[in-house]
Amino acid sequence: MRNNTVKVLTIQALIAAIYVVLTIAIAPFSYGAIQFRISESLSQLVVFSKKYWFPITLGVAIANIFSPLGIVDVFFGTLGTGLALAISIFVFKFVKNRIARHIINIILYLVICMPIIAYEITIFSGDNSARVPFEFGSFTAIYGSLLLSQVIVMVIGIIITEALNKAIDLKKVFE
């Protein structure tokens, strides 16, 4: 029992670390209104097991410490990711087809996580922090930019996780 706990924690720590490294390695592109966070492709791992939820969410929290928005990004980014992945995991109880799960995961990210991040960036970035009535135009532009990059990295995530699953059974990694 103890060996399995150590194994699970080690794997989760490695996944969180990979997320952080992939984010920080391309830091200028990982944060802000126009971002391309390749580490988000790891979010497709929850399709295989709910045990991937914690390391991905933890990776987001740690990576966002280095964001220009700091603790604000830690809060909103972790909230958005954690919520989107948790709802995906819940929906997966009713959906067994892996490709359908991947698509559902993308859709839930786009409608749950990305609006939270777009709101955060609209309110707390640069000159926008002084704008008290919420600027819907800014939000829409930021949301559109995030949407496009998120779809791209999540599709990359499908390709990577499906290829990886052929080599390593991603459902059984934690066993």
Question: Which residue stretches match the model-derived regions?
Answer:
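Membrane-embedded alpha-helical hairpins and interfacial helices in multi-pass inner-membrane proteins
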Residues: 28-33, 61-79, 83-175
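Hydrophobic transmembrane alpha-helices
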Residues: 1-54
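Small-polar-interrupted transmembrane alpha-helices in polytopic inner-membrane proteins
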Residues: 19, 56-64
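Small-residue packing motifs within transmembrane alpha-helices
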Residues: 9-13, 55, 73-76, 145
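Membrane-helix interface "capping/anchor" motifs
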Residues: 46-56, 93-101
